[in-house]
Regions:
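C-terminal capping alpha-helices of c-type cytochrome domains
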Residues: 102-136
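N-terminal signal peptide c-region/cleavage motif recognized by signal peptidases
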Residues: 13-14
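Positively charged n-region of N-terminal signal peptides that target proteins for export
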Residues: 1-4
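Electrostatic cytochrome c docking/interface patches
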Residues: 19-43
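The canonical Cys-X-X-Cys-His
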Residues: 36, 44-55, 81, 127, ...
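Gly/Gly-Pro-rich "capping" loops immediately C-terminal to redox-active cysteine motifs
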Residues: 29-30, 53-90, 96-110
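Extracytoplasmic/secreted proteins, especially bacterial periplasmic and envelope-associated proteins
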Residues: 35-39, 68, 76, 80, ...
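Sequence context surrounding c-type heme c attachment/ligation sites in exported
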Residues: 34-49, 60-63, 116-122
Length: 136
């Protein structure tokens, strides 16, 4: 918990509304795109496909509330993707997308999940690495 908070504070120290990104990896290393893909399609972990859709033929039921993930790597840099995952409300205060990298300052969190981020810093980096590969 303290490590995640420290990483987030370090990342946010280099983030501004003008640049709209988190340029530094939360782990200091690149993520693994294969692990990131498995997080995105896993409804028990990433929850991404509840709202998003994409080229995931193994998942017939996909969301339509949020942008299609196809071409995410062409639309946003890794730094922009990272911020969108860690704290999407930083970019859009009205978003319904959860802050996958925050554990404080949230509301309507089930008691069992209070004080926990939805994804670890490594999982976030893996998802960023995967989304960055989606160029078409």
């Amino acid at each position: 918990m303290k490590v995640l908070l420290a990483l987030l504070l370090t990342g946010f120290s280099t983030c501004s509304l003008a640049q709209q990104s988190l340029p530094n990896s939360l782990t200091g290393e690149k993520g693994d795109p294969a692990r990131g893909r498995s997080i995105v399609v896993n409804r028990q972990v990433g929850l991404c496909l509840l709202c998003h859709s994409g080229a995931f033929p193994e998942e017939p039921s996909q969301g339509d509330l949020a942008p299609d993930l196809r071409g995410a790597g062409a639309r946003w840099t890794e730094a922009q993707l990272r911020l969108r995952i860690v704290d999407p409300m930083h970019l859009n205060p009205a978003t319904i997308m959860p802050a996958y990298g925050k554990s404080e300052g949230l509301w309507r969190v089930a008691p069992a999940f209070r004080g926990q981020a939805l994804l670890t810093p490594q999982q976030i980096e893996d998802v960023v690495a995967f989304l960055a590969t989606l160029r078409d």
